Amino acid sequence: MNKFITFEGIDACGKTTQIELLSKYLDSIKEENIIVREPGGTDISEQIRKILLDKNNNINSYTETLLFLSSRSQLINEVIKKSIEKDEFILCDRFTDSTLAYQGYGRGLNIGLLNSLNDFFYFQMNNYR
């Protein structure tokens, strides 16, 4: 069974605080866990994060979405899959729901397409080949 928990919400609503509290609790009951964030969590994903968060960049909505998805793919393949295989809890600061909220509803991209792309990532997480 995957132990993958995502925390979603607007900026500064307490996601990081709740993740840290849950991680400390899991540590106290001897449950292995890791904390990851989107975008980020790997060297490549952190570089993508810098591009996305740079206010000087005027990124169109499609490029922005593809960068977020690229960061997610890297995180899944470098970190999340390995943690699933080790039966660790994965505590993730944002994931696919943020894509729907920000790129779908916020930027007006096609929700059906975003849902299909998000499904691909859940498949990727559970496919160990």
Descriptions of predicted regions:
Residues 29-31, 124-129:
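Short glycine-/polar-rich loops that comprise or flank the Walker A/P-loop
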Residues 4-7:
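Hydrophobic anchor at the beta1->P-loop junction of P-loop NTPases
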Residues 18, 22:
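Hydrophobic positions on the alpha1 helix immediately C-terminal to the Walker A/P-loop
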Residues 31-122:
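ATP-dependent small-molecule kinase phosphotransfer cores
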Residues 15:
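Conserved lysine of the Walker
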